[in-house]
Swiss-Prot record:
Listed InterPro entries: 4_helix_cytokine-like_core, IL-5
Glycosylation sites per record: 48, 77, 91
Protein name (Swiss-Prot/TrEMBL): Interleukin-5
Cell compartment(s), UniProt: Secreted
Subunit structure: Homodimer; disulfide-linked. Interacts with IL5RA. Interacts with CSF2RB.
Provenance organism: Notamacropus eugenii (Tammar wallaby)
Gene: IL5
Recorded superkingdom: Eukaryota
Lineage: Eukaryota, Metazoa, Chordata, Craniata, Vertebrata
Family: Belongs to the IL-5 family.
Amino acid sequence: MMKILVCLPLLTLYAGCVYGIATGNPVSRLVTETLSLITAHRTLLIGNGTLRISIPDPQNHPLCIEEIFQGIETLKNQTAEENVVEKIFQNLSSLKGYITAKEKQCGGERRRVEQFLDYLEEFLRTINIEWNTEWTVES
């Protein structure tokens, strides 16, 4: 069961990547690049592990955008500036324009950066898959 839970997000990411590449959707490519950068530089983003960032309750809608961007801003302010990390924040800033129209405010408790990154990755996968059709139509 645990292997399925670990493999499911990877399968979702792969499906999103394949769709994004096949459709040539620039937003999908940006999401895919950002997910890859977060995965590659997760340890750097986590730092010493003491920072706490609000994560919406999993029972709420998965796209609690305001909290996500507040968390991103908190993480950005607490992360040492390096070119590769700055690219993550540039990508996330670029994506903000596409997703604020779907904004939903949610409440949540403060958790470790690692848990926030898990939530952020799931958030990016969700917008990559669920909204891809809408972005393709609007382009």
